[in-house]
Amino acid sequence: YELSMTLAVLGVLLATGSLRLDDVVSHQASHVWNFIPQFIGFIVFTTAVFAETNRLPFDLAEAETELVAGYHVEYSSMKFAAFLMSEYMNMVTASALIVTLFFGGWSFPGMGRLSGWWLLIASVAVFVTKLAFFLWLFVWVRWSLPRFRYDQLMQLGWKGLLPLATVNLVWVGFAMAMRWL
């Protein structure tokens, strides 16, 4: 799923024309948010991020059959808490990337009329609200979906996400050639 995630990010970078995240946000502020023209890329990236963060339904390393021999058995107290905190920080980072790449980052329609401190406060509030939504989505998916088996995960990655990510990249290239994006 890392390859699919990379191809989805390449679609965003191709449409934006820059590798800088603030340029990606500026492009979305002056155009439409990337999840609309690249909805397939958004779905691929979000699914790959869920798999990358090892959250349910992709938490195969923490499945009941793996708990006896897993690495969590050897740690307790603060070391075990550090593992859990790193998983949650991974969720926050992944959610921040989703917001920045596909949902306009800290921009929101109508914020151009603000200036000074009001713009800063509104930008932080918009980003934190979008971030909180995707963190809620992580929790909701964990509560709602059952765990995948290894063969299902491999099939999803190679036969589902990778072809969709390739289609998204071809779509973005075609849309750029036709001057639609």
Language-model segments: residues:
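Selective transmembrane helix interface/packing segments
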Residues: 1-181
